[in-house]
């Protein structure tokens, strides 16, 4: 595994930001008043670039992982002279039980009290419920929402993104279209006409939020320069990011591992033991690699040994939300639906593994590959009630 210090960072299918110069004086004053002396000192120290030449970042999404991403980026934006201090974060407008709007509470308390309680995001994070306004003038877009919302978000932003804009997707999942599967980075690139990298890895958001050491992988195509910029923007002493020239491989790892985590949750719910769980994880990783290479022959073997690969499978199968909800599903012997369990256990967060399992199943069925991927096929059939949870080990592995 390669370690790169933050301080030295420099197929068969096609598959929110900185303060604008025109920002109202009242909003500017409000933000400035909230800033700490350290922030003011940092701004003075970044005098080498004028505001117009600095990169402006918007985080599109404000859930658990989106809030953590904003925290990471906000801390670095203050230190890096080429980035504007303010980081905008698009917040889907919702009203909290006390009647206050979530975005207002975030701006008042500097904390996402619903999805990341107890963690300060940084005084330079500004929540904005208006998607178009949040991305206005931004030239660095970070997409981090449930994958099922991405098509609608891209349609809203179509024609609104202008100039030299770069994007990165932290979204795990895919869209299944008539012509085949479409990765989220491809969806962003095609609908918005911009380059899109990806960031995936063994990243449980709450652990990164409290600054426990973690790794991640940035997948890029084309020039290494933009990948290094994203590495610089995300890296901290406790969050180590490595660039890999393999967008599809990195993104498919982040997508498919959630299906494996659902399988691991079934094993835990049925108390089948660690040996069985290890076997499921191995088979799952093997099917991840095989499917990735069938969809994109250019996917590199080495990608599966990065944080986005085997490390993410291990982390997600041990502690992720997909594993946890699947465990509860298996304990109920399928009598409680995933929708019911998601609402009860995740409190507004979205479960990715079940919808991804369905999408993967559709691809396998369309291509005639169901028998080649028995674990992926079985997970979907258990999720939909066609099979009982015990079926997770009642098949013969296909030697791909």
Swiss-Prot record:
Pfam families: NAD_Gly3P_dh_C, NAD_Gly3P_dh_N. GO terms for molecular function: glycerol-3-phosphate dehydrogenase (NAD+) activity; NAD binding; protein homodimerization activity. GO terms for biological process: carbohydrate metabolic process; glycerol-3-phosphate catabolic process; glycerophospholipid metabolic process; phospholipid biosynthetic process. SUPFAM superfamilies: 6-phosphogluconate dehydrogenase C-terminal domain-like (SSF48179), NAD(P)-binding Rossmann-fold domains (SSF51735). The active site is at 257 (proton acceptor). Disulfide bonds: none annotated. This is Glycerol-3-phosphate dehydrogenase [NAD(+)] 1, chloroplastic. It is found in: Plastid, Chloroplast. Keywords: Chloroplast, Lipid biosynthesis, Lipid metabolism, NAD, Oxidoreductase, Phospholipid biosynthesis, Phospholipid metabolism, Plastid, Transit peptide. GO terms for cellular component: chloroplast. Belongs to the NAD-dependent glycerol-3-phosphate dehydrogenase family. Expressed in young seedlings, flowers and siliques. Expressed at low levels in roots. NCBIfam families: glycerol3P_DH. Involved in glycerolipid metabolism. Pathway: Membrane lipid metabolism; glycerophospholipid metabolism. NAD(+) binds at residues 61-66, 92, 149, 172, 205, 321, 350, 352.
